[in-house]
Design a protein with these regions (language model features):
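Active-site neighborhood of divalent metal-dependent phosphoester bond hydrolases
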Residues: 84-88, 93-121
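Short, charge-rich binding segments
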Residues: 51-52, 80-84, 108-109, 129, ...
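Active-site metal-binding motif and surrounding structural segment of the metallo-beta-lactamase
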Residues: 40-91, 119-121
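Alpha-helix N-cap/helix-start and coil->helix boundary motif
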Residues: 43, 53, 66, 97, ...
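Conserved beta-strand hairpin/beta-sheet module of binuclear metal-dependent hydrolase folds
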Residues: 1-49, 87, 150-152, 159
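Generic structural signal for residues in well-ordered beta-strands
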Residues: 6, 115-117, 136
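Structured loop/turn residues at beta-strand edges in well-structured enzyme cores
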Residues: 51-54, 113, 132-134
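Metal-dependent phosphodiesterase/nuclease catalytic metal-binding core
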Residues: 121-178
Length: 178
């Protein structure tokens, strides 16, 4: 079975405590990391969990309360200092791009990688990410702000069947049977 597990980096409310960090989870699907929310302190928790920063390429933000997104700028900046070159994809309400772009322009100018925004409407159920391993769908939720959950659907791995080997063993089977 392929790897599919979740790391809870934080599950606290809007006020982190000494025992609970702000909201952030990382889903590991076949060694690709997907972050769901990025509360303050998420990058420290990533290090504690011994998760490789280089495998994190997609961040999904459920809504625009600070405890779900205040860790983004620090993480983006750290990736720049680590000389990351792979693009970082942020999937969130369109307003997040409007909020982050001035900060990126001021603090992160000249980074060796791009931050790519993928805005979505949290009030609509839609597929917002799809590759050969997984698809991600938004699920609208009730909250004080437009909010959604994320449904990660793992896709089956293709069978590793070689036609030439099937033909070879079938011909052997025919010879043995005669």
């Amino acid at each position: 079975m392929e790897k599919f597990n979740i790391h809870i980096l934080g599950c606290g409310s809007a006020l982190p405590t000494t025992r609970h960090q702000a909201t952030s989870q990382v889903l590991n699907i076949r060694e690709k990391l997907f972050m769901i929310d990025c509360g303050e302190g998420a990058q420290v928790q990533l290090r504690r969990a011994k998760l490789k920063f280089s495998r994190l390429n997609h961040i999904f933000i459920s809504h625009l309360h600070g405890d779900h997104c205040f860790g983004l700028m620090g993480l983006i900046s750290t990736f720049g200092m680590l000389e990351r070159t792979a693009d970082l994809h942020i999937h969130a309400h369109a307003d997040l791009q409007r909020l982050l772009e001035p900060q990126l322009e001021f603090f992160c100018k000249g980074m060796p990688y791009q931050v790519v925004f993928h805005p979505f409407n949290p009030g609509e159920r839609t597929v917002i990410y799809d590759d050969r391993s997984v698809s991600v769908e938004t699920i609208p939720l009730r909250h004080r702000l437009p909010t959604c959950g994320f449904l990660f659907r793992e896709k089956p791995t293709p069978n590793h069947i070689r036609r030439d080997m099937i033909d070879f063993y079938r011909s052997e089977e025919r010879r043995v049977g005669k």
